[in-house]
A protein has these predicted regions:
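A short, surface-exposed helix-loop junction/capping segment
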Residues: 30-44
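Nuclease catalytic cores
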Residues: 45, 49, 53, 57
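Short helix-loop-beta junction
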Residues: 55-66, 121-125
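Short beta-strand-loop-alpha-helix junction that forms the active-site gateway
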Residues: 81, 85-115
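Short, small-residue-biased leader/transition segments that mark boundaries at the very start
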Residues: 3-5
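Acidic-and-aromatic substrate-binding clefts and catalytic sites of carbohydrate-active enzymes
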Residues: 73-79, 105-106, 136-141
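Active-site metal-binding core of divalent-cation-utilizing nuclease and nuclease-like domains
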Residues: 48, 61, 65-91
C-alpha cells in the first residue's frame, strides 16, 4: 500500500514539476531598460541590478524555487517588471518578490507605495502573493531573513 501512495503522489507531482521546468526555461518578456545596471552576478550566473537581488536569486536557486527575474506583468493598463516572479514548487501558484533597496530616498519611497497600490488594486496582496523586502543605509539587506521568508512561503 505504501507503493500505491508513492505512485499516486508521484503522478500528482510530475506534471507540475514538468510545467515548472518548462516555465523556467521558456523565453519571456523581461525588462529591457538600463541593461548596463545589471552588474551583480548571482551564484547561478544571473546578472541582476543589486547585491541584494543577487543574494535573493542565489537563495531561490539554492532552495529550488522556480523564478524569473524582471518578467513582465500586465496589471490593467500598466506593465510592471517585478524583481522576481516565482512559482510554488508544489502547487505552481504564482508569487512576486519586490526588493525595495533605496528606501532612504523620498522619491523612491513614493514610487514604492504607488507600486504597492497597483499590486493591491489587482488583488496581489503584500504578505499573501507579494513578498516584499526593504533596505536603507542603516538597515541593510538581511539574507537570513530572506531565507526565513523562502521557508515560510515555500516550505523546506
Amino acid at each position: 500500500s505504501e507503493m500505491c501512495i508513492r505512485d499516486r503522489f508521484h503522478t500528482v507531482l510530475q506534471p507540475i514539476s514538468t510545467e515548472l521546468n518548462q516555465w523556467m526555461n521558456a523565453d519571456f518578456e523581461y525588462n529591457i531598460k538600463y541593461p548596463e545596471q545589471r552588474i551583480h552576478k548571482s551564484a547561478s550566473g544571473l546578472m541582476v541590478r543589486s547585491k541584494s537581488e543577487a543574494l535573493i536569486a542565489t537563495l531561490l536557486s539554492h532552495n529550488r524555487i522556480p523564478f524569473r527575474y524582471e518578467c513582465a506583468l500586465c496589471l490593467g493598463e500598466t506593465t510592471l517588471h517585478p524583481d522576481f516572479t516565482l512559482r510554488h514548487p508544489k502547487t505552481g501558484a504564482f508569487y512576486y518578490w519586490e526588493h525595495f533597496g533605496l528606501m532612504d530616498f523620498p522619491s523612491y519611497r513614493k514610487n514604492v507605495f504607488s507600486k504597492l497600490q497597483l499590486y493591491t488594486a489587482h488583488n496581489i496582496i503584500p504578505s499573501i502573493q507579494l513578498i516584499t523586502t526593504y533596505e536603507t543605509s542603516e538597515h541593510p539587506f538581511d539574507s537570513a531573513y530572506a531565507e526565513q521568508l523562502i521557508h515560510y512561503y515555500f516550505g523546506d
